[in-house]
Amino acid sequence: MAPPNASARLLLLVAAAAAVVLFAHLPTTTTAASPALKALGEDLLAAAGAAGFAGWLSGLRRRIHQRPELAFQEVRTSELVRAELDAIGVPYAWPVARTGVVATIDGGAGAGPVVALRADMDALPLQELVDWEFKSQEKGKMHACGHDAHVTMLLGAAKLLQSRKDELKGTIKLVFQPAEEGHAGAYHVLESGLLDDVSVIFGLHVIPNLPVGVVASRPGPFMSAAARFAATFTGKGGHAGVPHDAVDPVVAVSSAVLSLQQLVSRETDPLEAAVVSITILKGGDAYNVIPESASLGGTFRSMTDEGLAYLMKRIREIIEAQAGVNRCAAAVDFLEEELRPYPATVNDDGMYGHAKAVAEAMLGEANVRVAARSMGGEDFAFYARRSPGAFFFIGVGNETTMGPAAAVRPVHSPHFVLDERALPVGAALHAAVAIEYLNKHDCS
């Protein structure tokens, strides 16, 4: 390339200077935490990490872990929550959405906004395969998604917040929610009306592939909208040796399975995430009999509510069309009453920025990371639709569970474990997010 002449060099200098002026007003990606915020985070983390406090947290988590309860069956867990709130001196409403508890801490320093902090309480229908002293004592039930830790962290936050009650300007609501696992407990909590006055809401979820002391999230769309479906194809049963005298629903189901895969590969923008997974197939139970009916079921997900609605429409159309082509009838059920579809979890930019700043002040900027979008569904989305919300992952891994020789056991695994040193971190972060929000939005 030939060297530029003098005129060209002058133009380059002018352009560079203009760029400096143009972008000088833009904020940098990180800002130093105020001394007051940093001190708040340090104080709360030190209090939660003190031997007596941390031991109390571990004891709570182990008691909950040993007695897991499924969706809307969290009777014993709810009793434990209420007993601890009574001991701390925090009033509450119960029952909420059957087994839930909503506690309220009214600040003694004046009026202000209402901040909600949320933890889910239910376990999963899994047999725990981790051999340890505090293993689940309930056959076929396990806290394999860390909800025992979530409840513990929020109880820890309750204790921290109650100790500072007289300094708070505003109200903090602590939501101990039932039935996150597929049953949309958040929706039912909102139906109670107890959160109608909430200004903002914050939630945490454990994640085993991040170490203790690290949190992660992202602004905007974070977790997918998710729904389930089931379909039954009805034909005409008969002898497998004379299929022409029957109407085979197994062929119709098979055709539908293949056609449904094209929803992602041929109808979805490759730059937009979507999933259609068939996870259940049922037909006959004899080798020489064409069954009268066959069925399929599965899940579908999208990073947008609009995308989920499109998938729902097309799933019905494809199933009914494939049934018709194969001379069968089809009934499609999206299980909207039993397993209500979850909206996409979308973090409010302002609330995400607030929680991120608090976490950076407490844990250090290097320990607050940008998370990848997740195709997991989360009913925190219902809250975030109603009030500006922020949902963060909190690390529960360590050198043993994340080391080179270790296979990270994901949530929903019967081998899932967590490092209890994360419990004080979660308790302190919950409390700090709420306190700092009230401090920044003082109504006086």
UniProtKB/Swiss-Prot annotation:
Entry's SUPFAM superfamilies? Bacterial exopeptidase dimerisation domain, Zn-dependent exopeptidases
* CDD domains for the chain: M20_IAA_Hyd (cd08017)
Which protein, by its recorded name, is this?
IAA-amino acid hydrolase ILR1-like 8
Looking up Gene3D superfamilies in the UniProt record yields: 3.30.70.360, Zn peptidases
Q: What is its EC number?
A: 3.5.1.-
Tell me the Gene Ontology biological-process terms attached to this UniProt entry: auxin metabolic process
Q: Which InterPro entries match?
A: Amidohydrolase (IPR017439), Bact_exopeptidase_dim_dom (IPR036264), ILR1-like_Hyd (IPR044757), Peptidase_M20 (IPR002933), Peptidase_M20_dimer (IPR011650)
Q: Which gene encodes it?
A: ILL8
Please indicate if the UniProt record lists Cytoplasm as a keyword: no
Query: What broad class of enzyme is this?
Result: hydrolase
Query: A single Gene Ontology molecular function, please?
Result: IAA-Ala conjugate hydrolase activity
Q: Which positions carry the signal peptide feature in this UniProt record?
A: 1-32
Return the Pfam families for the record. M20_dimer, Peptidase_M20
